[in-house]
């Protein structure tokens, strides 16, 4: 008789423990949804709300070429490209950057890699997979970074690593 009574107590304790755990989980979940967590990038709006969009800042519009930060980085676009057509019907970028137009426009020529297909074969014109410039090349705007950045470019890293700062 005592064994049956103890077994019944154990079952009741297990059920009580499970019920208590369920109540604790529910209370914790409801307190999490009530909190507003803020992030430097998201702003003061609650995470499940969409805050107002930040204002669009003007693009830099200069003829200066920017230094690349790492090898093989696509060059950034130093001028505005508002209204440029870059689609299946045409590519406004090539009116200055095409091989035949660079002498007249004084713009840098499209890289020779843009004339290669995925098999390494050269084409007489831009490879279709490189036709849409803005997939890799982007204009730069005047925004201040929303978070601090201590990025160091490759040349600086290499000069620190070499004796005497030389490469």
Curated annotation (Swiss-Prot):
Keywords: Electron transport, Heme, Iron, Metal-binding, Periplasm, Signal, Transport. The gene is napB. Binds 2 heme C groups per subunit. This is Periplasmic nitrate reductase, electron transfer subunit. Residues 1-34 form the signal peptide. GO terms for biological process: anaerobic respiration. Electron transfer subunit of the periplasmic nitrate reductase complex NapAB. Receives electrons from the membrane-anchored tetraheme c-type NapC protein and transfers these to NapA subunit, thus allowing electron flow between membrane and periplasm. Essential for periplasmic nitrate reduction with nitrate as the terminal electron acceptor. It comes from the Bacteria. GO terms for cellular component: periplasmic space. Heme c 1 binds at residues 79, 93, 96-97. Component of the periplasmic nitrate reductase NapAB complex composed of NapA and NapB. Heme c 2 binds at residues 114, 133, 136-137. Pfam families: NapB (PF03892). InterPro entries: Multihaem_cyt_sf, NapB. Induction: Induced by anaerobic conditions, and further induced by presence of nitrate. It is found in: Periplasm.
């Amino acid at each position: 008789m005592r064994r049956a009574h103890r077994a019944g107590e154990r079952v009741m304790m297990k059920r009580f423990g499970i019920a208590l755990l369920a109540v604790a989980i529910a209370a914790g979940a409801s307190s999490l949804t009530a909190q507003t967590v803020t992030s430097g990038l998201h702003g003061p709006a609650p995470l499940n709300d969409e805050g107002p969009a930040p204002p669009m800042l003007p693009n830099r519009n200069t003829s200066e070429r920017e230094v690349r930060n790492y090898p093989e980085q696509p060059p950034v676009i130093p001028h505005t490209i508002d209204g440029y057509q870059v689609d299946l019907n045409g590519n406004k970028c090539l009116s200055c950057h095409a091989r035949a137009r660079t002498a007249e426009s004084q713009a840098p020529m499209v890289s020779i890699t843009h004339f290669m297909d995925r098999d390494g074969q050269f084409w007489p014109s831009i490879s279709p997979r490189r036709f849409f410039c803005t997939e890799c090349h982007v204009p730069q705007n005047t925004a201040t970074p929303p978070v601090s950045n201590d990025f160091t470019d490759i040349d600086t890293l290499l000069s620190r690593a070499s004796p005497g700062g030389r490469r």
